[in-house]
Amino acid sequence: MAYHLLQRNRNGGLNLAKALNEAMTHIGHCNACRTFTEEEECTICKNPRRQISGQLCIVEMPEDIQAIEQTGQFSGRYFVLMGHLSPLDGIGPREIGLDLLQQRLEQESFHEIILATNPTIEGDATANYIAEICHLYNVKVTRIAHGIPVGGSLEMVDGTTLSHSFAGRRDFLL
């Protein structure tokens, strides 16, 4: 990309540099959920309708919020970990903000915590750790389903995903 901008679009490169500088200067983290925002609280956290559901969805990264929002299936609030537990990499509970999550659970009332970490070993370990914390607050804890993607074929799915699909099966309603 750098070569292209230098050879063919220097003004575009300058505009990109200016936009990146603006973003780095003016965008920070939401005080409530930790996603990126230009204000102290993001638009989701400021929305009073989001509090009605009593649900808190915990995700690994800010872009996970966008993916969930595009489905239109969730109308609660979020908490962004900014990663997952990875002790070998020196990433423990404090590095992903679990102390801040506990503060939030103490200050706010939730009916359900939805764990939407990635379906990886680290994501599962993080979800299990968070579930233990949440049970201290007597709140319902659920995990998003994992399984076969729409349009996927069984022969192309790995054994772990297929096992999760069988374990998470549900009644077929007509």
UniProtKB/Swiss-Prot annotation:
Tell me which Gene3D superfamilies the record gives: 3.40.1360.10, 6.10.250.240
Q: Which first-to-last residue range defines the signal peptide?
A: none
Q: Does the keyword Zinc-finger apply?
A: yes
Provide the GO MF annotations for this entry.
Answer: DNA binding; zinc ion binding
Q: Which UniProt keywords apply?
A: DNA damage, DNA recombination, DNA repair, Metal-binding, Zinc, Zinc-finger
Query: Where are the C4-type-classified zinc fingers?
Result: 30-45
GO terms (BP aspect): DNA recombination; DNA repair
Domain named Toprim: which ranges? 54-149
The organism's place on the tree of life at top rank: Bacteria
Query: Which Pfam families does the entry link to?
Result: RecR_C (PF21175), RecR_HhH (PF21176), RecR_ZnF (PF02132), Toprim_4 (PF13662)
Q: Which PANTHER family does UniProt cross-reference here?
A: RECOMBINATION PROTEIN RECR
Please give the function described in this protein's UniProt entry.
Answer: May play a role in DNA repair. It seems to be involved in an RecBC-independent recombinational process of DNA repair. It may act with RecF and RecO.
- Report the sequence similarity comment from the record: Belongs to the RecR family.
Question: HAMAP family under this entry?
Answer: RecR (MF_00017)
| The protein's name in its UniProt record | Recombination protein RecR
Query: What species does this protein belong to?
Result: Haemophilus ducreyi (strain 35000HP / ATCC 700724)
